[in-house]
Amino acid sequence: MTKAEAFDKATKLAMKGDLALYDEILHPDYESMNQRVRINREMSKSILSENGPLFTVGPVQKIYENEEFVCIHRFSRIANKDVFYEVQTAITYENGKVIT
């Protein structure tokens, strides 16, 4: 499984409340930015598992991948609504784990 595939699978499982793979691929010092707000590992897990049912996530398209960086793109929608959006995600790795 590629890094992009693993991230996609882990995210989709986390959105259903299964955090095992997400825990496995995240670096202990993971941190991201979302709308200029810093999100740490535990916050990210909580956001995904609690808000997952609110979204329908489309298939992922890998834009770029190497050992240290992955860039993916996907379309999603708010569940049961005609509200669609697209997201481009940049993922960096440290020691084989997602760090940002």
Question: What is each PLM-predicted segment?
Answer:
Residues 1-100:
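C-terminal and inter-domain tail/linker signature
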